[in-house]
Amino acid sequence: MVLQQSDLLILGVVIGTHGLRGDLKIRGSDQDFPLLSKMHQLVFLREGETVLKCARRKAGWYKGHLLLQIAGYRDVRAVQHLVGCEVAVRRDDVPGLPAGEYYWFQLKGMTAVDRRLGALGCLEDIFTTAAHDIYVINGDYGEVLVPAVKAFIADVDLESNRILFDLPDGLVQET
């Protein structure tokens, strides 16, 4: 089966090797990055082209990076060609979450709608603060930063790719 780019979820990039036993040092791309340590089937990409499909042998954390060993590779020279590659997994292989919880990749790109104001725009990014995540929405109201708290989120509909908010007055600057 040929994998399409849309079938894959890129979770990190190989930034180097670690030690002599073929460990790869991976830097994460966003909050979904820790998922990579649990996935068994991996795809390494360079400029959108598949370099290697393989199984994870071992994974562990070291100084904020994921150290990854892949099956069949036990020497640093054998994995050196993977430095600079993106590390992806098949979207279909990602384990589900409990009801009401979502991976960031599921939310990014959703159409954001407020009950009172209507369409806000596209949920383009998410970042973390000490208190909670913040959704970055761009659209007719410019950039709107919405705290990701249950009080503001009325509904998340993955099938229709829409997130419905019930935002308080003053959070969105109306023109």
Swiss-Prot record:
HAMAP family per UniProt: Ribosome_mat_RimM
Subunit annotation: Binds ribosomal protein uS19.
Protein location: Cytoplasm
Function (record text): An accessory protein needed during the final step in the assembly of 30S ribosomal subunit, possibly for assembly of the head region. Essential for efficient processing of 16S rRNA. May be needed both before and after RbfA during the maturation of 16S rRNA. It has affinity for free ribosomal 30S subunits but not for 70S ribosomes.
Main location: cytoplasm
Coiled coil: none
Domain notes: The PRC barrel domain binds ribosomal protein uS19.
Entry similarity comment: Belongs to the RimM family.
Gene: rimM
PRC barrel domain sequence ranges: 99-171
InterPro entries, A to Z: PRC_barrel-like_sf, PRC_RimM, RimM, RimM_N, RimM_N_sf, Transl_B-barrel_sf
GO molecular function: ribosome binding
Protein name stated in the entry: Ribosome maturation factor RimM
Keyword check for Zinc: no
Taxonomic lineage from the root: Bacteria, Pseudomonadati, Thermodesulfobacteriota, Desulfuromonadia, Desulfuromonadales
Keywords: Chaperone, Cytoplasm, Ribosome biogenesis, rRNA processing
GO cellular component: cytoplasm; ribosome
BP GO annotations: ribosomal small subunit biogenesis; rRNA processing
